[in-house]
Amino acid sequence: MEIAALSPDVPPLAACALQQHPLYGAVLSALGGTARRLAMRRKGRDIGQVQIVRRRFGPLCIDWLPRGPVWQADTGTGARIEALRHLPASQPGRALWLASPDSPQDAALFRPLGYRALMTPQYVAELDLSPTQSARLAAQHGKWRNRLRRAQASGLTVYARPFDPARDDDLLGQELAQRRTRRYAALPPAFTHAWAATAPQATRLYLARNKSQTVAFMLMLLHPPAATYHIGWSGAQGRALSAHHLILWHAASDLAGRGFARLDLGHVDTHGSPGLARFKIGAGAHIRPLGPAMIRLRP
C-alpha cells in the first residue's frame, strides 16, 4: 500500500463532503491550520483520497479524518481496511486519531482497526440536483411547496452573485447576531472571509429583496461537483414572506444549471431544531446517517 501527498489541483474522486475537498484544506491552511491531502494507491492503482486535519492542544497532537476517505467506487472492503490501517504510520510524529466517517458503512471499516464510537451518528440532508426542475418540485412536501408558491407571488426578487467580503460584511454581522439570539453554532466569519479570499468564485450568495430592501439571504460554498449551504439569515419580513423557501428553490435551480450534482444542507436535528429539520425535509432533501465520531484506542 502506498500513501502519498496529493496536489490540491487534483480533483476529488466524487462529489465529496466539504471537509474532504481541497478547497477546505486550502482555507484551513490560510487560517494557520494544517491539512494534508493524500492519495491511497494499491499495486499502482488509485483506490481513494483522504484529507486529514492536524490540530494541537498544548503537547497533544490530534489527526482528524472528517467525512472521509473518498473511495474509488470499485475499491473492495479489504483494500479499504488495508489503506486505513497504513494511514497513521504514513504521517509524521505521534498523534491521537479521530475519525468522522461519512456513512455507517465506512464506520464499519474503522472498527477492526481499534476505532470506537465517541458519539452517536448525526443525520445530514442532501438535495439531489440531477432530476429535472419539475421532478424536484414534485419531491417537495405539500406545505413546503405551498409556501414556495406564496413567496413566488409576494413580489420578492432573488439575486445571485459571488460573495464580496467588503460589500457583504454587514450580512455576516446580521447572521452573527441571529446566531447569538437563537443560540446555534456555525463556522466563524473568518472562515467565510478566508474561503472567499482563497477562491473568490467558489461562493454563491442568494439575496431575497422586497423592492430595494434585503429581507433574507443564503450563502453557498462551491466545491465542485457539490455545493454546501454555509450560512443564512432572515428578518421578520423575510420570515413572513417565506423568503428562504424562495431562495432555496432559486439556488437549487441555479446550481443545477451550473452543473452541480448535489447541494448539502447540513445536519438534521429533529429534537434540537425541529423547525429547521422540517424545512430541509420539506424541501425534498434526502436524509441519511453519517458514521459516529470515533477515536482510535489501539494501534
Which residues does each PLM region occupy?
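Non-catalytic accessory segments adjacent to catalytic cores
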Residues: 78-121
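Glycine-/proline-rich flexible loop or hinge segments
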Residues: 60-73, 92-96
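A conserved beta-strand-loop-helix scaffold within acyl/acetyltransferase catalytic domains
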Residues: 2-43, 47-59, 104-105, 109-120, ...
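A short, internal acetyl-CoA/4′-phosphopantetheine-binding micro-motif in the GNAT/acyltransferase core
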Residues: 66-76, 130-131, 231-241, 269
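Short, conserved beta-strand segments within well-ordered enzyme catalytic domains
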Residues: 39, 51, 63-66, 98
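Active-site/acyl-donor-binding loops of N-acyltransferases
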Residues: 1-7, 54-57, 110-135, 257-299
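A structural signal for short, well-ordered beta-strand segments and their strand-loop junctions
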Residues: 95-100, 159-160, 207, 262-264
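Aromatic (often tryptophan-rich) hydrophobic motifs at membrane interfaces
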Residues: 81-89, 192-195, 200-299
